[in-house]
Each structure stands twice: as C-alpha cells, then as structure tokens.
Regions:
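ABC transporter nucleotide-binding domains
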Residues: 19-22, 29-201, 206-220, 226
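C-terminal coupling/interaction segments
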Residues: 2-13, 273-318
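ABC transporter nucleotide-binding domain
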Residues: 186-272
C-alpha cells in the first residue's frame, strides 16, 4: 500500500499551528504473528481535532496505547510534545487527558470523590471546572459510581479526561451519550480546541467524526488508507451519473478531467463525477437517451469504500 499523504491542516482562525504535538513514524506493533499496526505514519498538530476512523479491530486502540506507552511497540518512533513516548511517558501523561475505551470505575464511591482522586494522580485539581463540566453534561457528582448508567459512567470518563488534558486530550471511542448530551460534548471539545488544546479521537462513527473533527485519518487492517481534511473529503464525494442510451456509445467520449471512473453495467453507463458535470451532460446529450439518473455520492459511501478496501481516489492523497 502506498504511503498516504498528510492532508492540509484545517484552518479555523489562528488556533491551528504547524507545530506537531503527536508525531508517529513507521509505527509497527505485532501480536505474535498478527499485525496490530504496520508502518504507520501520522502527525497531529496543535489546536486541531483529529479523527482516527476505522472499523473495530483496525488498529485504532493499538496506536493510541502505543502513543501513551501502555503497550510496547515493535518498531517505529513516537514523540509527543517533542518527547519520546516511552522514555518520557510520565512527563507526557501529566499534560495529557486520556479516555480509554474500557474506562472503569471503582464501585461504591461518590463521583465527586472519585474524580478528585483520579485528578490528584495527575497533579490536577480544578474543582470549579469539574463542577462546570458535570453541570453541562448533567452528571450528578453525589451519586455513587455503582449507581450510574452506562452513559453516566462515560460522562465520568469524559470529565476526567477534559480536566487532566492540559495540552492534549486523547479519546478512544467516546460514544454512548444520548444525542443532546453528545452535541453538548462536541461544543465542549470545540471550546477546548479554541483554547489551543489538541484533541486526538478514535471512532468508528462517521457522523461523529464529520461533526467535530478538522481532519481524519482512516485506518484499515493496521495501515493508514488516507489522511485528509474533512472538507476536502466532502468535496470529493461528487455525483454518480447513470445513463441508458438507445445505441452503443464510446466511453472515451466521457473521459473528462474530474471524471473519476467510467464503467458499463447491464447496458448502462455509470460515471463517478467530481467536477466538470456540465461537460459530461453535454456529451451525454449528443446521444439518444432512454433513461438517466443523477445521484449524490455521499461521504458515507466514500468511507465505506475505504473500509472495504476499494480503489482509493488519487485526488484524495491516499
């Protein structure tokens, strides 16, 4: 697989710089003969929200745990804040908030005391922020941990990660909130971004990544498929034109710049069009048409193509 190009950093005001907070070079992690991740290269910049998207088992958690030295990598280099992820892991963790996918709670402890205990381990003590976040996420600080629903347990993990994340917040599959709380969570993440914090979040939820992230890295079978600005991917979605002609046509007539693929399917001509739609329509109109249908090629379909191992669009930088 060719090495994916790093997409342009999305600019929103002046909060995103070219300073690399996370830099991963040729990361490989083997579990015996099984590949967790292979030759992974990725940079995450200060002040951006980077989505790390892929199906379950693609290598997202392995990458995150390698970054935080929770597992030993097989090969490669990882630096965070310019520090070695393994040698300087203690210093890195003091500036990093982390929500693991398997976040657990000590039973029968009030949420308030549990959060204060967790934060004391990282040297963070901000009762005011804890109370504010709990109010916004509708988390009862005086409930005991064993009395919490799954969604409220997740809120505890979210609050501790946001409080501990002095400069960097790493989130491993932070899903499970109800829709209203999810939107409030997104607003909080954007506020943290505006303060200059960097957020690296893994997900298998396309809607989540599209809603909150500046860029996205898509991983499949332990290897990166594409790293790109969300807006660029949205622009790539394009159209799918299906045309049934009365007579046989030469497909070379429709090979315009901006036409991604052309194929014939049961007597129909099927074109994926990223730009130059007018030129294609004019060429089509030179023939007798029996039926024609123009559909939008959605972002979801694009991601499914990457997931399924379909041919990668060269214009996307994969």
């Amino acid at each position: 697989m060719s090495k994916p190009k790093q997409g342009s950093v999305r600019e929103r005001g002046d909060t995103i710089s070219q300073e690399k907070v996370i830099e991963i070079k040729n990361l490989t992690k083997m579990y015996g003969n099984h590949v967790g991740v292979k030759d992974l290269n990725l940079s995450v910049y200060r002040g951006e929200i980077m989505g790390f998207l892929g199906p379950n088992g693609a290598g997202k958690t392995t990458t995150i745990r390698s970054c935080l030295a929770l597992i030993a990598k097989t090969a490669g280099e990882i630096t965070i804040f310019g520090l070695d992820s393994h040698r300087d892991s203690v210093a890195i963790r003091k500036k990093t908030g982390y929500l693991p996918g398997d976040f657990g709670l000590i039973p029968s402890v009030k949420v308030r005391f549990y959060l204060k205990y967790l934060l004391s381990l990282s040297g963070c003590d901000s009762t005011k922020k804890m109370v504010s976040l709990a109010e916004r996420l509708q988390l009862d600080l005086d409930r005991k941990t064993n009395e919490l629903s799954k969604g409220n347990k997740l809120k505890v993990g979210i609050v501790q990660s946001l409080m501990a994340g002095e400069d960097l917040i790493i989130l491993d599959e932070p899903s499970g909130l109800d829709p209203l709380m999810q939107q409030e969570y997104y607003r909080i993440l954007h506020e943290e971004k505006k303060r200059g914090k960097t957020i690296f979040m893994s997900s298998h939820n396309l809607a989540e990544v599209e809603s909150v992230c500046d860029r996205v890295a898509i991983i499949r079978n332990g290897q990166l498929v594409v790293v790109e600005d969300i807006r660029v991917l949205q622009e790539k979605t394009g159209k799918v034109l299906e045309v049934e002609f009365r007579d046989t046509v030469n497909i070379d007539e429709f090979k315009f710049e901006g036409v991604g693929s052309i194929r014939q399917d049961n007597g129909r001509l099927v074109l994926t069009i990223h730009e130059n739609l007018d030129s294609v329509i004019k060429a089509v109109s030179n023939h007798q048409i029996l039926n024609m249908n123009l559909k939008t090629y959605s972002l979801e379909q694009l991601f499914l193509k990457y997931y399924a191992g379909g041919e990668t669009d060269e214009r996307g930088g994969a």
